[in-house]
């Protein structure tokens, strides 16, 4: 049977994935990735030693080999520095997407292949492909296509939108056809109560329990004071750095001289001047984008879908927790101009816009460069 190296996070999803692989007869090896230096982390919701211990215990229970691999340097250089640079320039970013592309489906697979002679890697993502959750339908002559997992609330294709053909063809997603409730039930039936009861990791794990997001960024980004202005140019406050703000976020009253019962929200960030543009009310028209530009989108299949499919058949999403909505996309040289059917709130440069077709196939995505217009 093929050898599969599975990424063991110490959580319930990777535990059940490993069990399902072993049940199907694969030669399974568990590999725990260390991506963050605990000296940087401090006290955390996801302490490395606990996760590593839980992952090891699951592998011991399944009687499969367990190893660890250190990707701290790669994660710092390929994911974290980009994350900081984006926030330093007032852009919103999704580090999980970069982590999947550069770490989990790149250097992780190289280690799996070169050190452990693996045929495939596996992860606990809620996603599936036309090749099947276990590559059982794979054909060398076919292109692999990425589809949403069975559980719409847990679907993680959003975070896999930049993974390419080669990377997907060597990957398995054992949970693609399962609901989260089924995964937890299997975990409890197999005696994995410890991981089944663990809280799900939410947000960016390296920030740590004791820190607020803005405090964490302050540790790495030098403060650069600026003004908070209304659209008409009136100054209503001052701030210590644009990295503490994102489009759509309510502005803390400590930064403001003006007051409003509706509250003031970030509608634009000028990285060149350091000015924050504010608007009044959480549903102000300036917080909604009806058109935005995507730069150099990456497609999962080997062709540009906009050359073959009517743009009216596309859906897009800019946040994983929001369902895809219909959109029209127009090619403008290396850019795509995207017009969602409904204006989207808090659309920010740096965010990823991920495209789907009407068959729940994830086509790819690209970074939002700028907002062309609002309602």
Curated annotation (Swiss-Prot):
Q: Which gene encodes it?
A: mttu-1
Q: So what EC number does this one have?
A: 2.8.1.14
> Where is it chiefly localized?
mitochondrion
Residue numbers spanned by region Interaction with target base in tRNA: 94-96
| Residues bound to ATP | 7-14, 33, 124
Gene Ontology biological-process annotations: tRNA wobble position uridine thiolation
Catalytic reaction(s) noted: 5-taurinomethyluridine(34) in tRNA + S-sulfanyl-L-cysteinyl-[protein] + AH2 + ATP = 5-taurinomethyl-2-thiouridine(34) in tRNA + L-cysteinyl-[protein] + A + AMP + diphosphate + H(+)
Would the keyword Lipid biosynthesis turn up in this protein's UniProt record? no
Q: Which UniProt keywords apply?
A: ATP-binding, Disulfide bond, Mitochondrion, Nucleotide-binding, RNA-binding, Transferase, tRNA processing, tRNA-binding
Tell me any Pfam family this protein matches: tRNA_Me_trans_C
HAMAP family recorded: tRNA_thiouridyl_MnmA (MF_00144)
Region of interest called Interaction with tRNA, as start-end residue ranges on this chain = 154-156, 319-320
User: Its biological function?
Assistant: Catalyzes the 2-thiolation of uridine at the wobble position (U34) of mitochondrial tRNA(Lys), tRNA(Glu) and tRNA(Gln). Required for the formation of 5-taurinomethyl-2-thiouridine (tm5s2U) of mitochondrial tRNA(Lys), tRNA(Glu), and tRNA(Gln) at the wobble position. ATP is required to activate the C2 atom of the wobble base.
Q: What else is known?
A: During the reaction, ATP is used to activate the C2 atom of U34 by adenylation. After this, the persulfide sulfur on the catalytic cysteine is transferred to the C2 atom of the wobble base (U34) of mitochondrial tRNA(Lys), tRNA(Glu) and tRNA(Gln). The reaction probably involves hydrogen sulfide that is generated from the persulfide intermediate and that acts as a nucleophile towards the activated C2 atom on U34. Subsequently, a transient disulfide bond is formed between the two active site cysteine residues.
Identify the residue position(s) of the site Interaction with tRNA.
125, 250, 351
Q: What protein name applies here?
A: Probable mitochondrial tRNA-specific 2-thiouridylase 1
Name the catalytic site residues: 99, 205
Q: Which family does it belong to?
A: Belongs to the MnmA/TRMU family.
The protein's organism comes out as Caenorhabditis elegans
Q: Where in the cell is it found?
A: Mitochondrion
Q: What is the superkingdom listed in this entry's lineage?
A: Eukaryota
Alphabetically, the GO molecular function entries are: ATP binding; tRNA binding; tRNA-5-taurinomethyluridine 2-sulfurtransferase
| GO cellular-component term (any) | mitochondrion
